Swiss-Prot record:
The lineage of its organism: Bacteria, Pseudomonadati, Pseudomonadota, Betaproteobacteria, Rhodocyclales. Keywords: DNA-directed RNA polymerase, Nucleotidyltransferase, Transcription, Transferase. It comes from Azoarcus sp. (strain BH72). InterPro entries: DNA-dir_RNA_pol_insert (IPR011262), DNA-dir_RNA_pol_RpoA/D/Rpb3 (IPR011263), DNA-dir_RpoA (IPR011773), RBP11-like (IPR036603), RNAP_asu_C (IPR011260), RNApol_insert_sf (IPR036643). The gene is rpoA. It is an enzyme of class 2 (transferase). It catalyses: RNA(n) + a ribonucleoside 5'-triphosphate = RNA(n+1) + diphosphate. GO terms for cellular component: cytoplasm; DNA-directed RNA polymerase complex. One of its GO terms (biological process) is DNA-templated transcription. Homodimer. The RNAP catalytic core consists of 2 alpha, 1 beta, 1 beta' and 1 omega subunit. When a sigma factor is associated with the core the holoenzyme is formed, which can initiate transcription. This is DNA-directed RNA polymerase subunit alpha.
Length: 326
């Protein structure tokens, strides 16, 4: 008997190419699942892994990013681009204020950044700037935690933080630099229509490539768990309210104690309830056989004593369940 159960990968091979590169191979998948899971993992790896990046910088003697600094080979734009290439990792906190102070001829690298024991510089040899004799570079760097790519103008800035010389940076928080996947044919026994998924990943060194894939898989599982526990949201059904009707209107016209002549004239026109009566106009009643002006005045006076008049409009009349008299 053929089983309808979906295959799950039984072979997972992790090949470490370098400290920042790895190739992960998984098989077998049912046909089509290689692309489904490969694309989902790739998008999560590129967009949803947390990381740290410089977000603001203040440089002594510099008012804006289009300035130059005496004694430094790079202009400020190039300096900021180099600064964005510094890979950092904060331990036990989500943001930090770092300092860099260097003077004299030489190369300024990420190693010159000072921030404390819980700030790890992943690429300390990364070049930030070159100073000439007599050159000096002093700056404060704010590092924050985030996800994906966040333009500087997308982050709200409070009024007290809008100071002259404060430069806001576009931040690329993702620790993953490159991800690609390939789906190949796989075979299990007599089945040859299966998928083999191969993922190549490169990080910036702040996270291990294998751990990055595990994290992305957990994110995907967490998001899909909502569908696994899918339940319809109960919608409260509010019963339709029947418009309330004055009980007086449900009483028969006999309760008005009209003269026999007037009462008989109304019943001849199928007017059995007070609610029927008040919806008629004077003109309509005067057309009733044997009902003259005297009877009309009598009806108007009796209705007025109960706060009612002729020609009134009633919605939902007659109400459901009203017994027909006659």
């Amino acid at each position: 008997m053929q089983s309808n159960a979906l295959l799950k990968p039984r072979i997972i091979d992790v090949q470490s190419i370098s400290p920042v590169q790895a190739r992960v191979t998984m098989e077998p998948f049912e046909r089509g699942f290689g692309h489904t899971l490969g694309n989902a993992l790739r998008r999560i790896l590129l967009s949803s892994l947390p990381g740290h990046a410089p977000t603001e910088v203040s440089i002594e003697g510099v008012l804006h990013e289009y300035s130059t600094l005496d004694g430094m080979r790079e202009d400020i734009v190039d300096l900021l681009l180099n600064l964005k290439g510094v890979v950092l990792k904060l331990h036990n906190r989500s943001e930090a204020m770092l300092t860099l102070s260097k003077s004299g001829e030489g190369v300024v690298t990420a190693r010159d950044i000072e921030g404390g024991h819980d700030v790890e510089i992943i690429n300390p040899d990364h070049v930030i700037a070159h100073l000439a004799p007599g050159g000096k570079l002093e700056m404060q760097i704010k590092v924050e935690q985030g996800r994906g790519y966040v333009p500087g103008n997308a982050r709200p800035v409070s009024a007290e933080n809008k100071t002259i010389g404060r430069i806001v940076l576009d931040a690329s928080f993702s620790p993953v630099r490159r991800v690609s996947y390939l789906v190949e044919s796989a075979r299990v026994e007599q089945r040859t229509d299966l998928d083999r998924l191969v993922i190549d990943i490169e990080t910036n060194g702040a996270v291990d490539p294998e751990e990055a894939i595990r994290y992305a898989a957990r994110v995907l599982m967490d998001q899909l768990s909502v569908f696994a526990d899918l339940e319809g949201t109960p919608v409260a059904v509010v019963p339709e309210k029947t418009p309330s009707i004055d009980p007086v209107l449900l009483r028969p016209v006999d309760d008005l104690e009209l003269t026999v002549r007037s009462a008989n004239c109304l019943k001849a026109e199928n007017i059995y309830y007070i609610g029927d009566l008040i919806q008629r106009t004077e003109t309509e009643l005067l057309k009733t056989p044997n009902l003259g002006r005297k009877s009309l005045n009598e009806i108007k006076e009796v209705l007025a004593s109960r706060g009612l008049t002729l020609g009134m409009k009633l919605e939902n009349w007659p109400p459901a369940g009203l017994e027909k008299l006659g």
